[in-house]
């Protein structure tokens, strides 16, 4: 029996297992998609513990499917005999039309698919993929300067409100 009326509030919450904050700094994210992950039991347990690293991960189409590569999901300690390989390729689940749309955009020069975060939505492991274009060193500096100026404006407004 669910605690809330209808049980929607508890199920609708997303529990973030890992986020790739560096990707938003290194790349311009132009579009995002949600995809399901095909995982083994020990991988799910390890994800729930937050034992995952997305820093070097990326996704790419192979044949008619999308795959997540270089995503390290650490071994689950209690899965002694039936553990998993931490760096194995993992299949992503999306609709055929979405996969075709993503494939068309990724095949353009300069674009890549980067996982932005892995989270649980209604008990299912999901990954948020971003269509990314690399930033140059100057672009990164511009982003830092823009962020700093926004902080300064927010601070000045906050000081003005306190008086």
Curated annotation (Swiss-Prot):
<dbReference type="GO" id="GO:0005829">
    <property type="term" value="C:cytosol"/>
</dbReference>
<protein>
    <recommendedName>
        <fullName>SsrA-binding protein</fullName>
    </recommendedName>
</protein>
<dbReference type="GO" id="GO:0003723">
    <property type="term" value="F:RNA binding"/>
</dbReference>
<dbReference type="InterPro" id="IPR020081">
    <property type="entry name" value="SsrA-bd_prot_CS"/>
</dbReference>
<dbReference type="Pfam" id="PF01668">
    <property type="entry name" value="SmpB"/>
</dbReference>
<dbReference type="InterPro" id="IPR000037">
    <property type="entry name" value="SsrA-bd_prot"/>
</dbReference>
<keyword id="KW-0963">Cytoplasm</keyword>
<feature type="region of interest" description="Disordered">
    <location>
        <begin position="140"/>
        <end position="163"/>
    </location>
</feature>
<feature type="compositionally biased region" description="Basic and acidic residues">
    <location>
        <begin position="140"/>
        <end position="157"/>
    </location>
</feature>
<dbReference type="InterPro" id="IPR023620">
    <property type="entry name" value="SmpB"/>
</dbReference>
<comment type="similarity">
    <text>Belongs to the SmpB family.</text>
</comment>
<dbReference type="GO" id="GO:0070929">
    <property type="term" value="P:trans-translation"/>
</dbReference>
<comment type="function">
    <text>Required for rescue of stalled ribosomes mediated by trans-translation. Binds to transfer-messenger RNA (tmRNA), required for stable association of tmRNA with ribosomes. tmRNA and SmpB together mimic tRNA shape, replacing the anticodon stem-loop with SmpB. tmRNA is encoded by the ssrA gene; the 2 termini fold to resemble tRNA(Ala) and it encodes a 'tag peptide', a short internal open reading frame. During trans-translation Ala-aminoacylated tmRNA acts like a tRNA, entering the A-site of stalled ribosomes, displacing the stalled mRNA.</text>
</comment>
<keyword id="KW-0694">RNA-binding</keyword>
């Amino acid at each position: 029996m669910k605690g809330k009326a209808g049980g929607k509030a508890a199920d609708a919450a997303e529990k973030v297992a890992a986020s790739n904050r560096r990707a938003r700094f290194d790349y311009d994210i132009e579009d995002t998609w949600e995809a399901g992950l095909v995982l083994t039991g020990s991988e799910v347990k390890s994800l729930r513990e937050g034992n995952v690293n997305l820093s070097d991960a990326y996704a790419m189409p192979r044949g008619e499917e999308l795959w997540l590569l270089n995503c390290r999901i650490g071994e689950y300690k209690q899965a002694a005999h039936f553990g998993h390989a931490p760096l194995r390729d993992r299949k992503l689940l999306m609709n055929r039309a979405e996969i075709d749309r993503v494939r068309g955009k990724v095949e353009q020069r300069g674009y890549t698919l980067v996982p932005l975060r892995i989270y649980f939505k209604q008990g299912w492991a999901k990954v948020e993929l971003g269509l990314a274009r690399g930033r140059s060193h100057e672009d990164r500096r511009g982003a830092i300067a823009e962020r700093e100026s926004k902080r300064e404006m927010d601070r000045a407004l906050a000081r003005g409100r306190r008086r």
